[in-house]
């Protein structure tokens, strides 16, 4: 945002900067959350006229037949004018994907709007890094109209910190404070298991970043609830609750290789 603010402060008032961005990275790295923050910041510094955030997925643009797709795309873009349009899984609009003629029409309209509405529309297109590179390469007009922002996978320490923040927000406690020390090594084992077992599409991931933490937490809570309902102990997390939760997610990764 510092670059954007500098551009606004030093630019000739007749020059319109383009703030369209590619958010590239794996799921769970906070792309949609950061996009909302960017929209608010752009409004606050006067880069867009409204504090407005509109979302759309690639399949919402394509409709019926080729001519209808263009009309539908214009409706989506018109509704987003004044603010930020966030397109998730934008790589599905690549002309290299299955619906070449439809996607070509979508991109043609999108590029024209980005050019003609520099002062009242910012497009943030998000998706996997490799696929987003293919998306940009599918149309010569895309590359020069987007800034590339890479979202890295969370480290094991960051996953642990997110878990602890989640636990604190829900008011859950450990049966023994020392149990906090086993969270990091368990996440490390889980991440390494995921990295060594590609998903059904052959993609190697750490398991979903923020989504991985939510899954682990839910499994631990489920193990705790089952134990508590059975009359065994209180609601604080036990070592067995924690290990059971992580083991469930580790087994999911192992099953992908079968």
Where are these regions (language model features)?
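Short glycine-rich substrate-engagement loop in P-loop NTPases that contacts/grips substrate
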Residues: 49-80
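Substrate-engagement module of ASCE P-loop NTPases
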Residues: 77-79, 106-121, 170
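A short helix-turn-beta junction within AAA+ P-loop NTPase domains corresponding to the substrate/partner-engaging
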Residues: 136-153
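Walker A/P-loop
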Residues: 13-51, 75-79
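C-terminal engagement/docking regions of AAA+ P-loop ATPases
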Residues: 223-258
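Pre-Walker A adenine-sensing motif
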Residues: 2-14
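Conserved AAA+ ATPase small/helical "lid" subdomain
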Residues: 150, 155, 163-236
């Amino acid at each position: 945002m510092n670059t954007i603010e500098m551009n606004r402060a030093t630019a000739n008032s007749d020059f319109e900067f383009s703030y369209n961005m590619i958010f590239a990275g794996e799921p769970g790295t906070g792309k949609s959350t950061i996009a909302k923050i960017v929209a608010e910041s752009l409004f606050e510094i006067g880069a867009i006229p409204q504090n407005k955030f509109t979302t759309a997925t690639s399949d919402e643009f394509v409709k019926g037949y080729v001519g209808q797709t263009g009309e539908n795309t214009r409706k989506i873009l018109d509704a987003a004018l004044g603010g930020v349009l966030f397109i998730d899984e934008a790589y599905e609009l690549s002309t290299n994907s299955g619906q070449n003629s439809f996607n070509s029409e979508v991109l043609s309209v999108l590029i024209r709007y980005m050019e003609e509405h520099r002062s009242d529309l910012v497009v943030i297109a998000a998706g996997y890094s490799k696929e987003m590179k293919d998306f940009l390469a599918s149309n010569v007009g895309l590359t020069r109209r987007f800034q590339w922002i890479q979202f890295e996978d969370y480290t094991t320490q960051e996953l642990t910190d997110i878990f602890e923040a989640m636990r604190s927000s829900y008011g859950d406690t450990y049966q023994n404070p020392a149990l906090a020390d086993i969270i990091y090594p368990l996440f490390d084992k889980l991440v390494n298991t995921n990295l060594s077992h590609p998903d059904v599409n052959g993609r190697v991931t750490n398991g979903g970043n923020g989504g991985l933490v939510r899954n682990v937490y839910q499994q631990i809570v489920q193990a705790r609830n089952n134990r508590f309902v059975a009359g065994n102990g209180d609601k604080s997390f036990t070592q067995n609750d924690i290990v059971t939760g992580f083991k469930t997610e580790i087994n999911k990764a192992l099953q992908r290789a079968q």
